[in-house]
C-alpha cells in the first residue's frame, strides 16, 4: 500500500485538472490512501471520489509562503510516501526539506517552463515528446518516466437523453453534428475550425450540418464575433462550459480537435470513450495518439481548407466514421485503460521508494 498526496494549484477544469481527479480517485479505489489538495473553489472538487481525502490550501501564487508552510504541515501531518504535484504552481510551492521524507514527483502534461520543475525528485510526462523535452533540458534520463493519461468508462446514454439534448439545442432530428470542445484559447485553434465550418455547405446528403462548441475562455467573445461575421449563427450552438460534457460527445457524429498546439489531447481520449469519430490536427499530441485511418483522421495545423475537406469527407461516410470510432475505442482499451495507468503509477511509486530506501 502506498500513501500518495496529490496537489494542484489551479481552479480550472482543463485536462490536467480532470486527470488529477481521475488518478486520485482511481488510486484511492484500489485501496491506496490518497489525499488531494486543491485551492478553495476549485471546480474539480466534485469530481473526486468518495475514497479520496480532501483538503484546501490557497496557493494564491508561486510566492505564497503561507501556502508553502501549509503544504509542509499537511505532509508532516499526513505522512505520505509520495507527493505528486501537477502544473507549475503546486510544484514550486512544494518544497521538501530533505530526502528523508516522501518522494516528490512532478507530473507534466505540457511543455512548461523548465525552471518550475527542478525541485522534484522525479518527473512523469504523459507523452514521449515531453519526456524528450525534459531530458533535452538536462533532467536526468533515469528519473524521467512516461505514463499516459486515461479516461473513465462513461455511462451509456440512451435515445431519450439524445432527444432531450437535441430539443434543448434546437437542432433538427436528421442533422449532422460536429463537436468542438475545450478552452476557448488561441492555442486550441477554434478560429480555424469556425473558418473551416464556414466552408461546409449548409446541407450534406440531404442532412443539415450543425456545429456545437462546448467551452469557455478568453477568446469567447472574439470567436462569437467571428461566427457572426461568417454568418454561422443559425447553425452554431454555444452551450458554454459543461461540468459533464458526456452528452455532447454522445450526440456528435464527429469530434474535431483543431488545436495549433496540443501536447496531448484529452478530448481525443474522451471522444474515443464515447465511440465518437475523431478528426484532429497534427499537433505533437495528435500525432502521438492517432494512427491516421485507423483510430482517427489528421490534417495539418492551421489549415482551414484541409480541415473543411476532411469534415466533409467524414460526414458523408458513415462507415468510415464508425470504423474510426471503433479503432479509437480499441486504442483506448489497450493503451489508455484505467487499470493499466494506475498499475504503471503504483509500480513507479514502489520503484522510487525502493531506490530511496537504498540510498
Segments the model singles out, each with a brief description of its role:
Residues 167, 224, 313, 320-335, ...:
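A short, well-ordered alpha-helix in the C-terminal region of glycosyltransferases
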Residues 129, 150:
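Carbohydrate-associated surface elements
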Residues 291-293, 297-304, 313-319:
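Conserved acidic donor-binding segment of nucleotide-sugar-dependent glycosyltransferases
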Residues 241, 260:
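Aromatic "clamp/platform" in nucleotide-sugar-dependent glycosyltransferases that forms part
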Residues 63-67, 85-91, 108:
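Short His-centered aromatic/hydrophobic patch
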Amino acid at each position: 500500500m502506498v500513501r500518495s498526496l496529490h496537489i494542484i494549484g489551479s481552479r480550472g477544469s482543463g485536462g490536467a485538472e480532470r486527470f488529477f481527479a481521475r488518478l486520485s480517485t482511481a488510486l484511492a479505489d484500489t485501496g491506496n490512501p490518497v489525499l488531494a489538495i486543491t485551492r478553495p473553489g476549485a471546480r474539480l472538487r466534485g469530481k473526486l471520489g468518495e475514497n479520496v481525502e480532501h483538503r484546501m490550501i490557497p496557493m494564491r501564487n508561486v510566492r505564497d509562503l503561507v501556502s508553502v508552510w501549509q503544504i509542509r504541515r499537511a505532509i508532516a501531518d499526513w505522512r505520505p510516501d509520495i507527493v505528486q504535484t501537477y502544473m507549475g504552481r503546486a510544484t514550486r510551492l512544494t518544497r521538501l526539506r530533505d530526502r528523508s521524507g516522501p518522494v516528490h514527483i512532478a507530473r507534466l502534461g505540457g511543455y512548461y517552463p523548465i525552471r518550475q520543475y527542478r525541485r522534484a525528485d522525479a518527473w512523469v510526462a504523459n507523452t514521449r515528446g515531453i519526456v524528450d523535452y525534459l531530458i533535452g533540458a538536462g533532467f536526468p534520463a533515469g528519473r524521467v518516466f512516461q505514463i499516459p493519461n486515461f479516461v473513465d468508462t462513461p455511462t451509456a446514454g440512451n435515445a431519450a437523453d439524445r432527444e432531450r439534448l437535441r430539443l434543448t439545442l434546437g437542432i433538427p432530428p436528421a442533422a449532422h453534428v460536429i463537436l468542438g470542445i475545450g478552452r476557448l484559447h488561441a492555442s486550441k485553434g477554434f478560429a480555424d475550425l469556425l473558418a473551416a465550418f464556414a466552408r461546409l455547405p449548409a446541407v450534406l446528403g440531404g442532412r443539415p450540418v450543425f456545429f456545437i462548441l462546448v467551452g469557455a475562455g478568453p477568446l469567447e467573445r472574439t470567436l462569437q464575433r467571428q461566427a457572426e461575421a461568417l454568418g454561422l449563427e443559425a447553425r452554431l450552438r454555444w452551450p458554454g462550459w459543461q461540468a459533464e460534457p458526456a452528452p455532447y460527445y454522445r450526440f456528435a457524429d464527429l469530434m474535431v480537435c483543431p488545436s495549433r498546439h496540443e501536447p496531448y489531447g484529452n478530448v481525443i481520449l474522451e471522444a474515443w470513450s464515447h465511440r465518437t469519430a475523431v478528426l484532429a490536427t497534427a499537433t505533437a499530441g495528435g500525432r502521438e495518439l492517432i494512427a491516421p485511418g485507423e483510430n482517427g483522421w489528421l490534417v495539418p495545423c492551421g489549415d482551414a481548407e484541409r480541415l473543411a475537406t476532411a469534415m466533409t469527407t467524414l460526414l458523408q461516410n458513415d462507415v468510415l466514421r464508425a470504423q474510426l470510432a471503433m479503432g479509437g475505442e480499441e486504442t483506448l482499451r489497450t493503451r489508455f485503460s484505467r487499470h493499466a495507468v494506475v498499475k504503471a503509477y503504483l509500480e513507479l511509486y514502489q520503484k522510487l521508494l525502493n531506490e530511496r530506501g537504498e540510498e
